[in-house]
Amino acid sequence: MDTKLLDILACPICKGPLKLSADKTELISKGAGLAYPIRDGIPVMLESEARTLTTDERLDK
């Protein structure tokens, strides 16, 4: 995924910023507490496809 997209993409639920996960397989929304998958370089920004962040992930800076 092109990291330049992070400057223009926002969480569709809370409209907050997104952060690329360390392994570059998900976009993380701390505001919504969700992780959106990246498949074949394309972020899947659907709430139904996102996973809920764990408590540790929510607290991790």
Curated annotation (Swiss-Prot):
Q: Where is the signal peptide?
A: none
Would you say which domain of life the source belongs to?
A: Bacteria
* GO CC annotation, single: cytosol
SUPFAM superfamilies linked: Trm112p-like (SSF158997)
Pfam families from the entry? Trm112p
Similarity comment text for this entry: Belongs to the UPF0434 family.
This chain belongs to which protein, by name?
A: UPF0434 protein PFLU_3771
Naturally occurring in which organism (per UniProt): Pseudomonas fluorescens (strain SBW25)
Lineage per the UniProt record: Bacteria, Pseudomonadati, Pseudomonadota, Gammaproteobacteria, Pseudomonadales
